[in-house]
Amino acid sequence: MMSEQVTAPVYTLRGLPLLGWRDMQHALDYLYADGSLRHGTLVAINAEKMLALEADAEVRSLIEAAEFKYADGISVVRSVRKKYPQAKVSRVAGADLWEALMARAGREGTPVFLVGGKPQVLAQTIEKLKRQWNVNIVDAQDGYFKPEERAALFARIRDSGAQIVTVAMGSPRQEIFMRDCRLVHPDALYMGVGGTYDVFTGHVKRAPKAWQNLGLEWLYRLLSQPSRLKRQLRLLRYLGWHYTGRL
């Protein structure tokens, strides 16, 4: 089945259209079927991003410009289900989608370019991707480059022929990078992946599966990093939107 034939419903939260993937397999089939990969930018949407959209016009324009916005946070999935009771939408965590996409890229021989992360973490990520899924990494660049080196890096990405470009720089830096790089190399699938390389290489622990399944990943992070409290308190505003139906 060609990827053009795989569709996904679109649900709107606070004016933001989100792809409604049923599960990981649906996400992969939507993005990537029979070697025909969609071109565009993937952005994971969680409650924190929903708040940032309201607070920052630049963030809103960056995220609105991305073609593929999907529900990465459990609270966003719950809001979609509340607003659209018939919706068959599931959480597709960005870190899991990236791994699934890399496994698929390995099978298909798709050229991949990795951007971001610390040099040591990036090197370990490349080594593990090649060992685990035989991923065709055509080139990579850690996150430590100067603004004046961006144009040369964009040209490197274009000249590498990469069809998947994953960018681990945190928001909104990674979204700005992807927007600008696409002007030079539009024929690729771009994915912002935050701290995914750190998790993949074991430098940062994710919440255990049981916590994830209960939708308590945020609590696990808070208990392991109390400095996140201020960030988490901001999310109370999102809960207010959810429970008062302002979505």
UniProtKB/Swiss-Prot annotation:
Pathway it works in: Bacterial outer membrane biogenesis; enterobacterial common antigen biosynthesis
Pfam families: Glyco_tran_WecG (PF03808)
Substrates-to-products reaction catalysed: UDP-N-acetyl-alpha-D-mannosaminouronate + N-acetyl-alpha-D-glucosaminyl-di-trans,octa-cis-undecaprenyl diphosphate = beta-D-ManNAcA-(1->4)-alpha-D-GlcNAc-di-trans,octa-cis-undecaprenyl diphosphate + UDP + H(+)
Root EC class: transferase
Any one GO molecular function term: lipopolysaccharide N-acetylmannosaminouronosyltransferase activity
Its biological purpose: Catalyzes the synthesis of Und-PP-GlcNAc-ManNAcA (Lipid II), the second lipid-linked intermediate involved in enterobacterial common antigen (ECA) synthesis.
Family listed: Belongs to the glycosyltransferase 26 family.
Keywords, alphabetical: Glycosyltransferase, Transferase
EC number(s) recorded for this UniProt protein: 2.4.1.180
InterPro entries: UDP-ManNAcA_Trfase_WecG (IPR023085), WecG_TagA_CpsF (IPR004629)
Gene: wecG
Organism: Cronobacter sakazakii (strain ATCC BAA-894) (Enterobacter sakazakii)
Gene Ontology biological process terms from the UniProt entry: enterobacterial common antigen biosynthetic process
Protein's recorded name: UDP-N-acetyl-D-mannosaminuronic acid transferase
